[in-house]
Amino acid sequence: MSLAALRLIAFILGIFLITLAVSMAIPMVTLLVFDRSDDLSAFLWASLVTFTCGILLVVRGRPETAQLRPRDMYLLTTGSWVVVCTFAALPMVLISHISYTDAFFETMSGITTTGSTVLSGLDTASPGLLIWRSMLHWLGGIGFIGMAVAILPLLRVGGMRLFQTESSDWSEKVTPRSHVAAKYILILYLSLTGIGAIALWAAGMTPFEALNHAMSLISTGGFSTSDASLGHWTQPAIHWVAVVIMILGSLPFTLYVATLRGHRFALIKDKQVRGFIGFLVATWLAVGTWLYVHSEHSWLDAFRIVAVNVTSVVTTTGVAVGDYTLWGSFAVLLFFYLTFVGGCSGSTAGGLKIFRFQVAAALLVSSLKQLIHPRAVIQKKYNGHPIDEDILRSLLTFSFFFTITIALIALGLALIGLDWTTALSGAATAVCNVGPGLGTIIGPAGNFSSLPDAAKWLLTVGMLLGRLEILTVLVLITPVFWRY
């Protein structure tokens, strides 16, 4: 990798840091509104440090002439998440008086929209800290795509390359130029956040709670302003609004753009969307009926509670209404399986994504047909289009390394001393970016604060690998990547 490319990457990272520093003004204003100026200095100092480092990278970074190759984009993508997390953790250290390990874990959980937390006492926590956590989700949800696509074209870098390295969306392009798509997506993201906040406010939350949860839910993140998560609010309207926002955040944003550009039935016609919604509704009905039979809840209450928790896990959001691990072994195993599903490709959700299951099903059907008709030429199709061999290779490679990554992280957590339930569910929830795990320690009613520091760093790596879909990060450790 050339020195000019590294300097250009440093320049772009500097712009990211400057943007991060400026965004810290929002929690500062929040603190002033709530008359909590005692925490103001923490964000002020963190902002100054971040801004200074950003300026240094910008001034020293950009060479006279340079272009990033596609391979350089992988370093930029991974580097941006790590560098931003490094500085975004500073306010948490200063306000919450926690170790940098805990602060980095919380920040990586926020930026990757995982939602696992080491903090408690959220109901009385600093409003500046709460809004900052929600902002990390919100910024992570969009993946800094809007900013990156606005900046990279100025540097003569194709913005769609960053789309490809941060997202598994391989659907057709909905706009001729990536920066046009980015503009639409940012407007949609802002609009959905605003609509969600207003709806939650109307349903019974305070404006501050509504804004925090709108940012957390649309990004499928999961941070809340209460230790009890959504269980803190008993109004059914709040729960149903949350379900809708989580689903909206889990649908392909490119199809929203297509809808706005005149393709009115783009979402409805998409096989991935239909499969995702169908899977959710079927799971709601099945598990809701099961909970009604095995509890004292009315059917409507059981259906609502299940809808929130199932949608939360499937969309990798991580909010909860009650502790579903207390429902029995069937529920525990079911929610563990649901951890892997994920939302739609091209959304803010994590996990394996629905389209991979659908492509695998299409491959199974074609293989069975081939067994019946050995000499027939059977074309593999998905969503009406032939499945390219590169897509199949990518799916198989990703699925293999996805499984291996979870297994290795779980083994590492067990080696550190965690019980097998905490180790396995912790690894799965980190790589799938879900949030809560299973068991009494990291389940919906617990948090990650009691874990050893080594376990937190290992889970942090898992969050990053999962968010960037593993291969984007793993390519950096191959010798051939650095050879030329």
Language model segments and positions:
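Membrane-proximal intracellular helices of multi-pass ion channels
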Residues: M1-Y484
